[in-house]
């Protein structure tokens, strides 16, 4: 396996995943994917969700450009009312195997430089949080 070119089989859902579902009793649902640590966008999402009494679900990859611990924690604290699902970024932060880098699963036509940079960003984030 090559760091940044593969993702973990652990990302796959268990075949019985629907047996443990959560019912959401809201008229409005925001599904936010790929926030990538953008706290300005998060503030806007929170403001709109508050006005509409919406439930927010963060569909993974909440973090990326919030590489510094304080920025990371700001995003975490400002998303506390939402339901958080793990994306590859979050999963690989807590993965003790540390063999997949960012877990981005870049295809072969993506340059090695991009893959290396993504792995370096992810490793810096992991180091800063450690």
Regions of interest found by a model, annotated:
Residues 1-78:
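N-terminal active-site segment of His-dependent metallophosphoesterases
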């Amino acid at each position: 396996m090559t760091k940044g070119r593969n993702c973990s089989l652990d990302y796959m859902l268990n075949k019985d995943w629907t047996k443990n579902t959560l019912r959401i009793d809201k008229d409005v649902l925001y599904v936010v994917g790929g926030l990538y640590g953008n706290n300005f966008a998060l503030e806007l999402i929170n403001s709109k969700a508050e006005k509409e009494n919406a439930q927010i679900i963060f569909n993974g990859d909440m973090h990326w450009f919030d590489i510094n611990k304080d920025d990371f924690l700001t995003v975490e604290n400002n998303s506390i009312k939402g339901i958080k699902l793990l994306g590859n970024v979050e999963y690989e932060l807590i993965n003790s195997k540390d063999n997949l880098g960012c877990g981005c699963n870049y295809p072969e036509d993506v340059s090695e430089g991009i893959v290396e940079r993504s792995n370096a960003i992810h490793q810096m984030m992991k180091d800063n949080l450690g």
